[in-house]
Amino acid sequence: MWHAPRTLPAAAWTLLAALTATASAAPFAYVPNEKSGTVTVIDTARQVVVRQLPAGKRPRGIAIDPAGRRLYLSDAAANALVTLELPGGASRSTPLGKSPEGVSVTRDGKLVAIAVEESNSVTLIDAATGAQIADITVAGKNPEHAVFSPDGRWLLVSAEEAEQVDVIDVAQKKQVGAVAVGLRPRGIGFSPNGAIAYVACELVNTVFVIDMESRKAIARIPAGKNANGIVVHPDGKHVYVSNGVDGTVMMIDTATNTVSATIPVGKRPWNMALTPDGARLYVANGRSNSVSVIDTLGARKLADINVGELPWGVVIQ
């Protein structure tokens, strides 16, 4: 069902104004803080916080379009997707189902996908208009992440109460299959060419490697306790997985599917993002209220940056 965009509250206009003032000095890391209702903006050149921005009552999922023109936030309390034009211009809020979480955008910036937990669905939004164009029911219960493949053909969907990753054909706007993995799949990442997907399964402490052509898991990589966040290096040679209980990030060599380094970070590391050149990894530490900065070449932590309460993840542009 199509929903017309609605006017944003004053707090969102404050957020837009602040982002407008800083957008020209990119790259910035944007960190949604679920409990404090803010987005922390980090200058990645200096590793310092430059703003704490109001962002609704419960911001969780976050994505930014490849051109850096729009920031997308799921507000779980308002059941809405907030879209902010960067560096300035129109803003809008699109109603969603109950408890939206993970947000993803296609590489061409045309489509936005949001995993909606209590609806057991993935909502597709037209990025240009803000209109809802599809609401796709998935098999997994409480979907958390919905991630586009690099070519935008597929969406992989992880759900907290599942042992599979659901596969959506974006053109058909429906689920067309599923890949068996371990209990509670969470973070999802793709190799640069989209041939391989990596899925962290929290309750089995394992990263599953999926061949997208056959839609089958072809390898299992032991990770730390409560593996959850996943990000793939731009060169495709390494994958990073956060381990919530251990308070670590593991670096996986994709040539051998083995762990090549384990890096201590903060408490309950969650979702992560790499700088465009892949030189730095930013890790949201949900229980430390901080972001850890990792030097990917040296596989070592460089800094911990204080943010808001219960940071959910990071995007960088």
For the regions a protein language model found, what residue spans apply to each?
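Predominantly soluble domains enriched in secretory-pathway, periplasmic, or organellar proteins
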Residues: P5, W13-Q317
